[in-house]
Amino acid sequence: MKKKLLVLTMSTLFATQIMNSNHAKASVTESVDKKFVVPESGINKIIPAYDEFKNSPKVNVSNLTDNKNFVASEDKLNKIADSSAASKIVDKNFVVPESKLGNIVPEYKEINNRVNVATNNPASQQVDKHFVAKGPEVNRFITQNKVNHHFITTQTHYKKVITSYKSTHVHKHVNHAKDSINKHFIVKPSESPRYTHPSQSLIIKHHFAVPGYHAHKFVTPGHASIKINHFCVVPQINSFKVIPPYGHNSHRMHVPSFQNNTTATHQNAKVNKAYDYKYFYSYKVVKGVKKYFSFSQSNGYKIGKPSLNIKNVNYQYAVPSYSPTHYVPEFKGSLPAPRV
């Protein structure tokens, strides 16, 4: 009798583990809004769920960092009031875009494991409304709560840095010796001292590259590198760098704003208001990393060498398709025109 009971108990535990495992696998493939980039690990740990959403006051759009509103998890988003607000605050340190609330916020169940940054963050930790990314080590990330009306960025123990990009060109040199800020780029350099070209296309630590003038001239010695057209911020896979090219075939450096027009023109120091999304998919392999990166197809338009393993989450960003703790579902179907 005891043996039967033991077998039954073990079977139940085993079945429970399988169910939990399947649930975990499902949770990490959750999608996010088209203006968000999925972090490299723990997609289910991005935003905390909050059950008191019914009592949440309206968002003060003019000063979001002082607002204490919360956004509920994905299954409750349809019940959130004030859908016209520019943004919602989540757990004092997060905001999510208000344009599409259908599938933005995954569950976050390890709120107590997060280290919060003080509210007096410098301007260097603000994020432009068109750019967002989250560090790969979500289990021990630090949140930055200096945000604008649309986006939030996260750091991971001072290692991951996101860049604010507000114009087509940068006219000042970045001081590579220390943290550097101008109105276009914010850099906390580690690898960046290697790059002395007057362009503002810099490698940030080992994990991020930012677009800029003549970015195609930067290839990291000793590391596999990829050149990708248009705006692309890619989380780390080891030390791979991703740098968008800028040359005769890619004079399209502009901030996409999802206007109706889908053409893009090159203008000096002026933000373009249109975004030709199809060029996001043209790329060039620099040092043979095809086994690590790939692109989804955009309306049949594709330029370059054999497929690389990067999958597109939205028009502006690409994220690695595989790491030991991360998976991003591949975009399927034709890309729609940029939304207004």
Swiss-Prot record:
One of its GO terms (cellular component) is cell surface. Residues 1-26 form the signal peptide. The keyword Signal applies. Keywords: Signal. Induction: Expressed in the stationary growth phase. Regulated by Sae, which is essential for emp transcription. Repressed in the presence of glucose as a result of a pH-mediated decrease in expression of sae. Also under control of both Agr and SarA. It is found in: Cell surface. Strain Newman has emp expression enhanced compared with NCTC 8325 derivatives. Adhesin that binds to the host cell extracellular matrix proteins fibronectin, fibrinogen, collagen, and vitronectin. This is Extracellular matrix protein-binding protein emp. It comes from Staphylococcus aureus (strain Newman). The gene is ssp.
